[in-house]
Amino acid sequence: MQKVALVTGAGQGIGKAIALRLVKDGFAVAIADYNDATATAVAAEINQAGGRAVAIKVDVSRRDQVFAAVEQARKALGGFNVIVNNAGIAPSTPIESITEEIVDRVYNINVKGVIWGMQAAVEAFKKEGHGGKIVNACSQAGHVGNPELAVYSSSKFAVRGLTQTAARDLAPLGITVNGFCPGIVKTPMWAEIDRQCRKRRANRWATARLNLPNASPLAACRSLKTSPPACRSSPARIPTI
């Protein structure tokens, strides 16, 4: 039976690259994104190439929508085995410019979105009668704070902690939980960060070069062990690329 994965934020960038990699590895994939048009385009690209995918519009900050998206994927694709909680935002926020609105928006998407995704996946795994795999997008910014990204960095520190804790909580259920930590990747999100910062502080970043999105699926799909043998443990690995 074909395995099923749902990837949030899969309409572009790293999320799209992960979805394409999963399809290459034999998965049917739910392309979940806030932007319905980009999700539909990615799903169409996969289906036209002989893969199997569905597009699902979802606002990951809304718990009810995340649960509905996972259930839709489970029914449409005939099962549920993996969720990749990849969706996130990274507004430029120097300390003195942080507002309550920015904090709420970033944490609602980057942190709550991961929590809702993990909860929805656990529910789906239980319905399917087996364990499964949860993969959360962390970041190098979740290890070392980066200038002008205080709120984003702190949200990724939170995701890192959630991932390590969930790995221990869910291991008895046969559910593995891991994270992957990309550095600066050439994606639309990074282009927006760069636009906001105007490169004026580029020399302060820990990583100077831009990685390509196709590097991240290797961390998300290989280092995080989405293959069957990984069911024996839940190491909460958080590789940095």
Swiss-Prot record:
GO terms for biological process: acetoin catabolic process. The active site is at 152 (proton acceptor), 156. It catalyses: (S)-acetoin + NAD(+) = diacetyl + NADH + H(+). Substrate binds at residue 139. Keywords: NAD, Oxidoreductase. NAD(+) binds at residues 6-30. Gene3D superfamilies: NAD(P)-binding Rossmann-like Domain. InterPro entries: 23BDH, NAD(P)-bd_dom_sf, Sc_DH/Rdtase_CS, SDR_fam. Catalyzes the irreversible reduction of 2,3-butanediol to (S)-acetoin in the presence of NADH. Homotetramer. Belongs to the short-chain dehydrogenases/reductases (SDR) family. This is Diacetyl reductase [(S)-acetoin forming]. The lineage of its organism: Bacteria, Pseudomonadati, Pseudomonadota, Gammaproteobacteria, Enterobacterales. The gene is budC.
